[in-house]
């Protein structure tokens, strides 16, 4: 295992992270650096800890009981695991998109405006501009500009997922976490999301969990392979997929297990 990125180029630094579901030790001594304005992918078999690791970056685990993290996660040099961390501000700065599209039960416009209203006081014109900006960034504006006040549920599955991405970036986070964002989508919608991910890294640090190794190879700059709660190998994506250093990594990417 190698850390890949030096501190100067890192947005997130993870040091000796351990995570527990009750007494179950789910993440074991994880250390890695997530590069700024790059796409980092976490791969590995089901139950390896990749989604758990992702959710430590905005402390989503605090929504549930009997879960705790130990170690350090530095976001721009500040440890987010301390009790002093404002969780609401953290989640505004570290947005998240889940496996299944989760539009709010409201209009397309209000799906985007909802989070913005929690953190900013904008005029109607400013909010209109922000909604258009977010939908444009998510490659959805041309498809929704004439039906902004229709329900978010009226969109197709792929459009709903892009709406969730637009909602996530509308509050202008610096990091975007994607937890298997294409697993419920058809190949065409998946292709559009992958194109979007590649475009977003110019402005955001993106971390994606995926079961699809081809997707990781297409979309990411760096890839981490995890197994049974441990970080087995972390490298630039081309190197990990073509010349992995660890036999476990090679076995997984060649289909011998997982």
Swiss-Prot record:
It catalyses: phosphate(out) + ATP + H2O = ADP + 2 phosphate(in) + H(+). InterPro entries: AAA+_ATPase, ABC_transporter-like_ATP-bd, ABC_transporter-like_CS, P-loop_NTPase, PstB-like. Gene3D superfamilies: P-loop containing nucleotide triphosphate hydrolases (3.40.50.300). GO terms for cellular component: plasma membrane. Pfam families: ABC_tran. The keyword Kinase does not apply. It is found in: Cell inner membrane. Keywords: ATP-binding, Cell inner membrane, Cell membrane, Membrane, Nucleotide-binding, Phosphate transport, Translocase, Transport. GO terms for biological process: phosphate ion transmembrane transport. The complex is composed of two ATP-binding proteins (PstB), two transmembrane proteins (PstC and PstA) and a solute-binding protein (PstS). This is Phosphate import ATP-binding protein PstB. It comes from Photorhabdus laumondii subsp. laumondii (strain DSM 15139 / CIP 105565 / TT01) (Photorhabdus luminescens subsp. laumondii). The lineage of its organism: Bacteria, Pseudomonadati, Pseudomonadota, Gammaproteobacteria, Enterobacterales. The gene is pstB.
């Amino acid at each position: 295992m190698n850390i890949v990125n030096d501190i100067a180029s890192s947005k997130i630094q993870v040091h000796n992270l351990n995570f527990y579901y009750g007494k179950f030790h789910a993440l074991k001594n994880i250390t890695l650096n997530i590069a700024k304005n790059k796409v980092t992918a976490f791969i590995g078999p089901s139950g390896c800890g990749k989604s758990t690791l992702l959710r430590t970056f905005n402390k989503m685990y605090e929504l549930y009981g009997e879960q705790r993290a130990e170690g350090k996660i530095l976001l721009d040099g500040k440890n987010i695991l301390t009790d002093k961390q404002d969780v609401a501000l953290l989640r505004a700065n570290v947005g998240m998109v889940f496996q299944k599209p989760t539009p709010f039960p409201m209009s397309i416009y209000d799906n985007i405006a909802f989070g913005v209203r929690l953190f900013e006081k904008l005029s109607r014109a400013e909010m209109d501009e922000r909604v258009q900006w977010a939908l444009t960034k998510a490659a959805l504006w041309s498809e929704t500009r004439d039906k902004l006040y229709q329900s978010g549920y009226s969109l197709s599955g792929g459009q709903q997922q892009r709406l969730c991405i637009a909602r996530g970036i509308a509050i202008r986070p610096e990091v975007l976490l994607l937890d298997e964002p294409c697993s419920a989508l058809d190949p065409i919608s998946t292709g559009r999301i992958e194109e979007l991910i590649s475009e977003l890294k110019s402005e955001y640090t993106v971390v994606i969990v995926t079961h699809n190794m081809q997707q990781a190879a297409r979309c990411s700059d760096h890839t981490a392979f995890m197994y049974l709660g441990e970080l087995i190998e972390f490298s630039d994506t081309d190197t990990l997929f073509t010349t992995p250093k660890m036999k476990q990594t090679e076995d997984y990417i060649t289909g011998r297990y997982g």
